[in-house]
Amino acid sequence: MATVVGFDFGLKRFGAAVGQSVSMTASPLKEIPAQDGIPRWEAIEALLEEWKPALVIVGEPLNMDGSVSEMALRARKFARRLHGRYNLRVEMADERLTSSEAKSMVRERYGQRDFGRFAVDSIAAVFIVESWLEAHADNLDAFLHPPRKQGKSNDIID
């Protein structure tokens, strides 16, 4: 069993979720405040220390046509910083429509539009993690436990 942590990148806050490879499910975590896309690193560090993930997944907000958006570039920069600061394997995952899906779920389930009360960004992070786990179900073990090459890093940032 391996633990995976996922982030929904944002300018004001980051959604966070933790997933398990055995259950192929994820649960929302407390959102992390950010200022202009820069997270409170001490909150990120505490989360990573608590969950000790084998892999971190960062949502990549591509444009609807699949082209790279300015936000996607910023999310990639965040992923590189995660890798550099904590020496973790980081994967990017297409997050198109996850925030819309999370808001729809809150509206349907609770009849609410006060999305701040429901940690919508962390719900989006759940969708990011679960989608990634599902997409890699056939070779999950290889992603989560790659053989180490002597003297080389296998850490991946797409």
Curated annotation (Swiss-Prot):
Localization per Swiss-Prot or TrEMBL: Cytoplasm
Annotated Pfam families: RuvX
SMART domains (alphabetical): YqgFc (SM00732)
UniProt xrefs under SUPFAM superfamilies: Ribonuclease H-like
Broad enzyme group: hydrolase
Metal-binding as UniProt keyword: no
GO MF annotations, alphabetized: nuclease activity
Coiled-coil annotated residue ranges, if any: none
Biological-process GO terms, alphabetical: rRNA 5'-end processing
GO cellular component, one term: cytosol
Keywords: Cytoplasm, Hydrolase, Nuclease, Ribosome biogenesis
EC number: 3.1.-.-
HAMAP family hit by this protein: Nuclease_YqgF
Family of the protein in this entry: Belongs to the YqgF nuclease family.
Function: Could be a nuclease involved in processing of the 5'-end of pre-16S rRNA.
Record protein name field: Putative pre-16S rRNA nuclease
Species name: Hahella chejuensis (strain KCTC 2396)
